Amino acid sequence: MTKRAFLFAGQGAQKLGMASDLYAAYPVVKETFDTASRILGYDLRELIDSNEEKLNQTRYTQPAILTTSVAIYRLLAENGIIPDIVAGLSLGEYSALVAAGALSFEDAVALVAKRGEFMETAAPAGSGKMVAVMNTDPSLIEEICQQASEKGVVTPANYNTPAQIVIGGEIAAVDYAVELLKEAGAKRLIPLNVSGPFHTALLESASQKLAAELETVAFNDFDLPLVGNTEATIMKSVDVKALLARQVKEPVLFYDSIATIQEFGVDEVIEIGPGKVLSGFLKKIDKTLPTHNVEDQASLDALLNA
């Protein structure tokens, strides 16, 4: 019996027209988008298909990716493909909560629209930067970030793979950390095109607003295990609100989360949502783990015929 993990895509994976073929072909996908549009008060499908500028603004990106991901999840469930364990990268954690039965889709849509707004306000475009540091010892990166903190906020934000760690924070501090990392022998440092320095202390105000918002939402018990980003452990219902509030300002422990999923005995991973970013990380973490992604009709067919 296959033990299957679903991984849900995070911000940055969005693209114009994502899942438009699935929307046209499957009622469950269309219904999911229609529900989201009703809650948001604008036509989400139209925005995804025709307004790239808005699609890349955090307050719109987040409900767009969540809705695309949950629609694909529901389509897979209709085809009898269901997970034994779930996780999501940052924003993707909200899709994972829906899949795990802990959060209604309607509440998730309203919540991530607010989350996107809070994050945009806390870290407006141009207020900070993020840089991927390749093939460098994680403890050296942590040490150098601490050193560079004399210039402002800079910390590891995403532990994507053991060979790719993203640092983020205030521009002067990140630039200084990059300088120190180069002096220490780091060869590949890639500035990222992101809306803001997410998963750093600069998101403190967003974290506080989100904590207040989360108090108004009812969470249910989990139907299946979910590995959370912030501690890379299986989330307990009692901790969900606190962990989600922390998640926006603390690093994402992605490769540790994958280790937890592997301890669960998973032998197949399906990435859900636009792009193949997480599948790419997985290949770097453990290339023996069978991985699929589902984002459109072609990738759905490939999975169903595998």
What do these predicted ranges mean?
Residues 2-140, 188, 268-297, 302:
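FabD-like malonyl-/acyl-CoA
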Residues 4, 8, 48, 153, ...:
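Short, flexible segments with low predicted structural confidence
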Residues 12-13, 101-242, 246-248:
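Alpha/beta catalytic cores of group-transfer enzymes, especially the acyltransferase/condensing modules
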Residues 61-63, 197-198, 251:
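Glycine-rich phosphate/pyrophosphate-binding beta-alpha loops
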Residues 74-78, 143, 212, 260:
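Residue-level signal for well-ordered alpha-helical scaffold segments within enzymatic catalytic domains
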Residues 77, 182, 262-265:
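Non-catalytic positions within long, well-ordered alpha-helices that form the structural scaffold/packing
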Residues 219-228, 241, 246, 250, ...:
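Cys-dependent protein tyrosine phosphatase-like superfamily
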